[in-house]
């Protein structure tokens, strides 16, 4: 299988111009042992390492060379400070340094070991030695312990014990070091079974910190699942149990096969190379591939391409490599537990059928060559897993046979008729995703089944919107869809839980989810390309024309509902009619809303909030009503205005309001005001307006969430800069505006409504209501408002993204409105700047829908000129140019 190899090989070309390696510190004279000279020579060594790396020298060679250099430096300093004359003391390398692995910024962990506690003079000399190393800017971690203290502290602390297990003598008393080794490898010091289980728990806890996946878009090369720590865990376990000090020795002890050893060596080499490059880019120790470092690292590793392509190619290789490490790590730890430790007598396997048996709760092959002889048996195993809830996983030796068979397939599994029948049977079974598709993905069987899947494995997008790679995102979409069958999901997704049981064929939704992003990374429109793939796959798997076309439509239109709800004016009947015409039926609408919600939730866990939920619900029910009414029948807007007014009046009469005064207020309002507000909102506004001093602006902050956010209502004399003043103040208060409805009455009073959220997507905190209200009052009263208020600086993370500003004017038959879709880099004060431009050009804003997608904003503004007409072509051009000039600053704020 192709998952054996990375797609974009690194350049390893050696050049003959590399300078000679600096001399080792063991040759230094006593007169050289001072900070300036040592720092100068250490800097020269580090320059040589960078030069050698850039010239193609392998990371393995350079890592070992650095460890060797530090060995010689410490040996020379040990002698210089007279410790060669101190009996029963030793200097010991521990941790990664103990393994002989030092990257440019790695910690240098050492143990000063002694038989008896050091006297004051010797302790002072140790302090001088360590201080000198710190003055050289080396990251040195040290401990000074007696042999007895080492053993006691090692027994009490797993990390200390692990460091000691991979200790290595640098210089000093050999017998003392061997005595320590004898103790730490004895049965009384962390017995192998106890050590193993402690390291497994430690790994599980570490993985949880990274959400159980190496596919985070800013991974930690060392600690993320599938990273170097997972290889270290295997080494630690084998070191403690067998005394093995390398991957090759693990083969000798039967813990690894030759193929597995080679695969781990290749993986370690790749991860070392990326980590070495990262350390050359940084000035302080860190192992995280953050966005602002990825391009520099990719270029250092000679990845090529336009724009973000070098990063995407490098990260694809990284994710594919960590997948392999994760699979090997899980399999080998399981194998160690089941076959080598054998803590309990092996439970007698229970036959499941002629081919498979159950060992505990793990499925196991009865014939180890079955998968090679009959590749379709792989699918039979996963079909058994989805049908039998007693099966919780795959036995380690069967995973080993599966990996072997997978690499020797002559054609994709979907070319086998029986495999296709089994695949569809899996999809139609409850629990298909969690019990079959997820493990199929983890063991690269989805890739072996459908070649298209391989192209998205590890495929990232260099942005702040997509939290996972395309394959990981797709699996999360599938899992989210499956959760809609669970009543426990109802509180978070009530609409989807209500609709999911009404889908006639849920397997078609799973197929659409499987293909919705399958064409990403190919170039072109991934929705259209993916729909083409989906039709071919559906027909190959025996679906009829209606079923195939539904799957293809869902793939082609999987973004339609999200875009319409978040970036279009869904209170405009024309928008609802256009959307309904595409959807065509209530059945397709139910499929589409389920896919849309799952897609949003699986893109980024922070995206889903009550605001988005309210938008999708509103669009769903408006479309359902339109489909039931019939496409030829548009809503009666006059009747809706009358209905809203009557309902609001009924609410207000309960408060014994002055109806004559109310009608004076309402008579100044235009029809749009009544159309776009609910009766409850109309009554809320009216109650306060009737009691308010009409010579002052009114600011209301709703105590109850409106469409998932907090509603802020402003009544004030209108002026061109009002919108900019309000949104500028809201931005200064760290509130995000998601929706704005702007109305100007016949008497020139503005009646504006804003929906705002806190940074975490929640409604405005109650204790902030009076503060925000007062701040807005002051902002509105500033008659000299000319420029947006001083805004926060662009965040460091955003500085590394480039989003060219686009001003797209959407087609419409409305002669009184222009619909502007603005795409730009998200930046503090953006709305205030945009509002200032509108004011400068004399444009009136009627509504705004604000959508932030990672580092991008994709906003919709409904505009008119001073004569309440759509913008002329000349005005559009000027507006587009002003927006580009303002939102594409060269210094990025």
Curated annotation (Swiss-Prot):
GO molecular function, one term: [protein-PII] uridylyltransferase activity
Reaction(s) catalysed (UniProt annotation): [protein-PII]-L-tyrosine + UTP = [protein-PII]-uridylyl-L-tyrosine + diphosphate; [protein-PII]-uridylyl-L-tyrosine + H2O = [protein-PII]-L-tyrosine + UMP + H(+)
Ribonucleoprotein is among the record's keywords: no
Stretches the record annotates as Uridylyl-removing: 352-710
Activity regulation annotation text: Uridylyltransferase (UTase) activity is inhibited by glutamine, while glutamine activates uridylyl-removing (UR) activity.
All residue ranges annotated as the ACT domain in the record: 711-793, 819-893
Protein's GO biological process: regulation of nitrogen utilization
EC number: 2.7.7.59, 3.1.4.-
InterPro entries referenced in this protein's UniProt entry, alphabetically: ACT-like_dom_sf, ACT_dom, HD/PDEase_dom, HD_domain, NT_sf, PII_UdlTrfase/GS_AdlTrfase, Polymerase_NTP_transf_dom, UTase/UR
Region (Uridylyltransferase): 1-351
Keywords: Hydrolase, Magnesium, Multifunctional enzyme, Nucleotidyltransferase, Repeat, Transferase
Annotated Gene3D superfamilies: Hypothetical protein af1432
Domain HD, first and last residues per copy: 470-592
Cofactor(s) demanded: Mg(2+)
Physiological role: Modifies, by uridylylation and deuridylylation, the PII regulatory proteins (GlnB and homologs), in response to the nitrogen status of the cell that GlnD senses through the glutamine level. Under low glutamine levels, catalyzes the conversion of the PII proteins and UTP to PII-UMP and PPi, while under higher glutamine levels, GlnD hydrolyzes PII-UMP to PII and UMP (deuridylylation). Thus, controls uridylylation state and activity of the PII proteins, and plays an important role in the regulation of nitrogen assimilation and metabolism.
Record note on domains: Has four distinct domains: an N-terminal nucleotidyltransferase (NT) domain responsible for UTase activity, a central HD domain that encodes UR activity, and two C-terminal ACT domains that seem to have a role in glutamine sensing.
Family as reported in the entry's similarity comment: Belongs to the GlnD family.
Xref: HAMAP family: PII_uridylyl_transf
Cross-referenced PANTHER family: BIFUNCTIONAL URIDYLYLTRANSFERASE/URIDYLYL-REMOVING ENZYME (PTHR47320), BIFUNCTIONAL URIDYLYLTRANSFERASE_URIDYLYL-REMOVING ENZYME (PTHR47320:SF1)
Record's protein name: Bifunctional uridylyltransferase/uridylyl-removing enzyme
Phylogenetic lineage: Bacteria, Pseudomonadati, Pseudomonadota, Gammaproteobacteria, Enterobacterales
